[in-house]
Structures are given as structure tokens and as C-alpha cells.
């Protein structure tokens, strides 16, 4: 059989445009702002996502169309942190979720309130975490006990922020954890607003475990 080498040229790299002489950063950002996340990822970033094999399917998310946030009964902030701010490092991610009841007869539902992802040095991550806590005032803050999550836990607890550490048990990898929550998505209990950050989270979920 023929041997093929796949070459990918995403329009934007971590340090800027792949071809800065032709496409400027601000021009690419304008293009990105006009496109759905799925189309931007496929056509410009060489990262198409497929529904086939996806554990969390796009159509399982319920789009929350109201412009105002529903009355929340509990706010949860979740952190998945990386080690270093370098191009080969994983991203650190902060997501904020709210528990609400769509009507009197329904059970608890979950809405994505905010999502931030980037590569941060620890002082940046600490400042960002404090800003996010002050803005959303979550009742529960969950930080995975790995990488920079451990010193971040220590710093936030010094400021009387109620951090709960999460340590996955052996055999309970990310694939298993996603499978465990998939029924919540499939049953229509997970909502997301019509905003860019939510589109990006939905696409990232749809790409798992292959993305």
C-alpha cells in the first residue's frame, strides 16, 4: 500500500499565524469570529470533528436561548490544570457551571456559564482563578490534584476559598469519566448558551476521544 504522510498547516499556531506574511493575526481573528467553531476548526485549523465515535454528541446539548441566566441553586467551578506555559504543554481549563430547575416539576439541570482555556504560568493562573472566583462566587471549587492544581489549591485555600481536590482512582481515566456522565447529556439535562466559548466546549467534547 502507498505510504502517506499527513501534513497539517493550521492557520493559527500558539505563537501566531503559520503564514504571517499573508495572513495577519487580527485578520484571522476576524475570520474566526464570523464562522461556527466546527467550520473554523475544519477549514482553517485542520482539526475536523466527526459525530461518529463521539461519546458526547453535539445534539445532546440543549441550547439555552434566554438572554438572562436562570435562577441558580448552586454554582460549581472546575479546574483542569497543566504544568508549564510552553507550546508543548497541555492547556489549563476553567469551567463554571450552574445548577438550576427549568420548571417546578423538573429535576436539577446543569448550565455551562463560562469556560476559559489557555497556557499560563502559575502567577497568571493564580490571578485568573481569583478573578473567576470573585466574579462567579461558586459554592464549590473542584481542582484536579495534579500538575499546578496542587499549589493552586494551597494558594486558594489560604484565601479561604472552599477548594475540593479531585483525584481520579485507578482505572477511572478520562474516557471512563466521560462515559459516566454521558447519560446526563443524552437525557437533555446539560445546557449551554449561544456563545462562542460554549461552541468551543461543545466541539471539544464532540472531538473526544479522538481530538
Q: Where in this protein do the model-derived segments appear?
A:
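Nucleic-acid-processing active sites and adjacent nucleic-acid-binding tracks
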Residues: 95-143
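Hydrophobic residues at beta-strand termini and immediately following loops
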Residues: 7-10, 115, 166
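Repetitive beta-architecture junctions, highlighting loop-to-beta-strand starts
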Residues: 4, 92, 108-110, 203
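Signature of the SF2 helicase/ATPase Hel1-core->accessory helical subdomain module
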Residues: 1-14
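Residues immediately flanking
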Residues: 79-81, 115, 145
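ATPase catalytic-site recognition across NTP-hydrolyzing enzymes
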Residues: 15-81
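C-terminal nuclease/phosphodiesterase catalytic domains that cleave nucleic-acid phosphodiester bonds
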Residues: 38, 42-47, 82-89, 95-96, ...
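Catalytic phosphate/metal-binding cores of nucleic-acid and nucleotide-processing enzymes, i.e., regions
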Residues: 72-74, 98-101, 150
Amino acid at each position: 500500500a502507498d505510504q502517506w504522510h499527513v501534513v497539517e498547516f493550521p492557520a493559527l499556531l500558539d505563537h501566531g499565524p503559520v503564514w504571517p506574511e499573508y495572513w495577519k493575526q487580527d485578520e484571522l481573528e476576524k475570520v474566526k469570529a464570523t464562522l461556527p467553531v466546527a467550520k473554523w476548526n475544519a477549514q482553517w485549523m485542520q482539526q475536523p470533528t466527526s459525530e461518529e465515535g463521539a461519546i458526547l454528541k453535539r445534539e445532546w446539548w440543549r441550547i439555552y436561548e434566554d438572554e438572562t441566566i436562570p435562577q441558580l441553586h448552586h454554582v460549581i467551578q472546575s479546574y483542569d490544570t497543566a504544568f508549564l506555559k510552553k507550546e508543548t504543554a497541555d492547556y489549563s481549563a476553567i469551567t463554571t457551571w450552574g445548577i438550576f430547575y427549568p420548571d417546578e416539576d423538573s429535576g436539577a439541570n446543569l448550565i455551562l456559564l463560562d469556560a476559559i482555556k489557555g497556557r499560563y504560568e502559575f502567577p497568571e493562573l493564580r490571578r485568573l482563578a481569583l478573578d473567576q472566583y470573585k466574579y462567579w462566587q461558586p459554592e464549590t471549587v473542584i481542582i484536579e490534584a495534579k500538575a499546578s492544581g496542587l499549589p493552586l489549591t494551597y494558594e486558594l485555600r489560604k484565601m479561604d476559598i472552599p477548594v475540593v481536590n479531585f483525584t481520579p482512582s485507578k482505572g477511572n481515566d478520562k474516557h471512563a469519566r466521560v462515559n459516566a456522565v454521558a447519560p446526563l447529556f443524552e437525557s437533555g439535562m446539560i445546557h449551554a448558551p449561544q456563545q462562542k466559548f460554549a461552541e468551543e466546549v461543545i466541539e471539544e467534547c464532540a472531538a473526544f476521544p479522538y481530538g
